[in-house]
Regions:
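Structural motif corresponding to the intra-repeat A-B loop/turn of tetratricopeptide repeats
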Residues: 2, 41-42, 76, 112, ...
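Solenoid-like repeat scaffolds
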Residues: 13-24, 50-62, 87-97, 123-133, ...
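Terminal, low-structured helical/coil segments at or just beyond the last alpha-helical repeat
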Residues: 179-187, 192-199, 283-315
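Residue-level recognition of tetratricopeptide repeat
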Residues: 36, 71, 107, 144, ...
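Generic helix N-cap/helix-start motif at coil->alpha-helix transitions
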Residues: 1, 22-33, 58-68, 93-104, ...
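C-terminal structural cap/anchor segments
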Residues: 131-141, 148, 153-157, 165, ...
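TPR-repeat structural position
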Residues: 5, 44-45, 79, 115, ...
Length: 315
């Protein structure tokens, strides 16, 4: 069977909007999966969040839908909305008690630089979660909090748990483990800028980096991250033409580094040119992303690049 991504998503939406008896049987699941399909395969953020905000989701009583919305908002620089949903979930005997709500609140508060609230939530997640996923990542975030607060001893203690606790199946846990093994710490200025940017606070993040150049950083990885971070901030602020030169600099500086900055920069340039309607250049940069080896988040970045190529080829 063959078809277009947009046609497949349209069929799911048609099913959601159908009024027949059959559509009610799986409507809950279809409502859960449709925003992910639009986000991950169409690459359309505006369409995704427009659907979430205009659809009759019960984001307090339906934990499945609430998790979907929280996850998407959190991963797309809208930490305040993610935190609002996660904080207003109504407890119910119909659902298992999931520590992942604490993890999401920890992430959201950290991106707001609400460090004490983030620490409490992340500690609650670790204390109550019996699984192995995202444990390394949670411990890394706790180490960052201690590091930012100037408690180096506690930061090192949390980092030792990154090495010994949880597994490294997810990309986030792989990255946390890689960082811990290196034994180095992120530059405090770049870390604060990253967290604010991830939370959706682009102007505050830009203010932290104002007046600096890559020459202000000693480590090669920090020079690459500085270029990438500026590109990402301008990109998220809706200024793609200003983002491209910084992304290009990140590719040039970091193509052979184990960090994800260069590969992600190539992916983002591809997405920018796709939005501009220049499929040829978009494919070139998606392929640049795919060609980079042995870097963090390779699985997820490669998947996004491959999906981008498929979208461009179908246009």
């Amino acid at each position: 069977m063959t078809g277009k991504i947009s046609e497949g998503n349209a069929l799911v939406l048609k099913y959601i909007n159908s009024k027949d008896a059959y559509s009610n049987q799986c409507r809950n699941e279809a409502l859960f999966v449709y925003p992910y399909l639009v986000m991950n395969f169409e690459g359309n953020k505006l369409k995704t969040f427009d659907f979430i905000e205009k659809t009759d989701f019960d984001l307090t009583g339906n934990h499945l839908h609430a998790y979907m919305a929280t996850n998407l908002y959190l991963n797309n620089q809208q930490s305040q909305k993610a935190l609002q949903i996660a904080s207003n979930i109504n407890p119910s005997n119909q659902y298992l008690s999931l520590p992942f709500w604490q993890l999401e609140m920890g992430y959201a508060n950290l991106n707001d630089l609400k460090l004490d609230a983030a620490k409490t939530a992340l500690q609650n997640f670790i204390g109550n979660f019996k699984g192995q996923f995202y444990v390394k990542d949670a411990y890394e975030k706790l180490s960052w909090i201690a590091y930012i607060q100037g408690d180096q001893a506690k930061a090192k203690a949390y980092r030792s748990n990154v090495l010994s606790k949880g597994n490294d199946i997810t990309d986030a846990d792989k990255q946390a483990l890689q960082n811990a093994k290196k034994g180095t710490w992120p530059h405090p200025i770049l870390l604060r800028a990253r967290l604010l940017s991830d939370g959706g606070y682009q102007q505050q993040a830009l203010a932290i980096l104002a007046g600096k150049t890559s020459n202000d950083f000693e480590k090669a990885a920090d020079k690459t991250e500085f270029a990438y971070r500026l590109g990402r901030i301008y990109d998220l602020a809706g200024q793609p033409d200003q983002a491209i030169p910084f992304y290009t600099s990140a590719i040039e500086k970091g193509a052979n580094q184990p960090e994800y900055f260069a590969a992600r920069a190539a992916l983002q340039i591809g997405l920018i040119y796709e939005q501009k309607g220049n499929s040829s250049l978009a494919i070139t940069f998606f392929n640049t992303c795919l060609e980079m080896k042995n870097h963090a988040f390779k699985n997820s970045l490669d998947q996004k690049a491959k999906t981008g190529i498929q979208r461009c080829l179908r246009k």
